[in-house]
Amino acid sequence: MYNNYVDLAPVNANWNEDILIRMPSGGWQQAWFRCYSPKPSQVVNLSRAITSVMQDKFNPTAGGPDVQTAVDPWSRVDYDERIPGAGTMLSDYYSYGQLLLEQQQIWNGPVYSECGNNYYYSGLTTGSGGCDHGYDFDKKPWLVDFYLRKMQPLSCNWSLGYGDRSEKDCDRFFAKTIAFGMPCGFLGGWRLNLDYLMIRGYYMLQQLQSNYCNAFIKDIRYANAKGELLDVSKAISTGAYKRSQIRLEYDNGLVIWINGNNEENWKIPKANLPPTGYYARMPDGTLEEFSAINNGERIDYVSSPDYDYIDGRGNWFEAPKGATDGQLIILKNKDGSREIIPNGSKKIAIALEQKPEAIIALDKDRKEIGQSAVEPRGGYFYIQPVPGAFSYLLKFR
């Protein structure tokens, strides 16, 4: 549930000149356009009054106090001499912290704020947007230790980007989100139609983030020009961290290699990573995924308990679980059946231990529109397309 205790407009029913932050000059603290900032000492009372109305009307289970973690603690200091702690950052920091903690109790669920200065509030809120307005992640080195070791155990911030729309920008958006151990924001948001970039973003990140967001970082290494993996102290002293080629190991065994370099490929034991490429694997093999070079072309692949994802990016790509020249999603249903969803694919094939008993073509409303057939060839079962089919449900004996 959206709520805001940083921007108060004169048309608000709670407007009162005496609850506004006073500057050293005695003037009101300006906030967003046509708005002024309420006193930090008053925001908890405002929250309690407003959230009780929200609960009665909507009964939400999560909150979004906007702007709260976008501003640094010293930019909303109240200099009103009538207020205890006037002119100190501690008074507003304490009040904002109490607000964020209380909201989690009120909603009995997560509370996420905006972004920009969220590191000051780690542990006080469930999380915030991951953007740091003062740092250019697309051009500057990725130094991930502070976030992964200090912030991530306290708060789960999300998404290092704004929904970039080119393929190159999206690749970098995904890679930096993985490098900093964040869940990925839904690319493009609700404003845009579902397209191949959104599909790629969801399937490349969903299973991977389910593993690293539920674990703590164990080891961080940065590669130098020789491929040697250095700890952060040696990486900084030698300048190797500027290459942004990072190996992460989490305490659940997950290992991730991310090439944040803008120009150079990075050959690792299991893959050849292009700029913004990555490789991840759980030690038991339940999850393996990569965005890497295959036969000179970049491809994307996920093998996981819930689904397999194969993306040839317009080129024919033969993966362990299937093959396609577009995007291919293989959903693994609990009853043992498989739903095959192609997108932009001229040919699709899947690797199966046995031939399906039935292949049912479904439309977008999941209505049956016919039967398909498979042709075994080259270690795969090639699915014969059915006009108008959105997906194919494979059933086995």
Predicted regions and their residues:
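Active-site-proximal substrate-binding groove within the catalytic cores of carbohydrate-active enzymes
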Residues: A13-Q354
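Short beta-strand micro-motifs in enzyme catalytic cores
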Residues: S244-I246, V255, G379-F381, F390-Y392
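Surface-exposed coil/turn segments at beta-strand junctions on protein surfaces, enriched
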Residues: Y250, N343, P376, P385-P387
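Exposed aromatic-hydrophobic patches
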Residues: K347-L352, Y380-V386
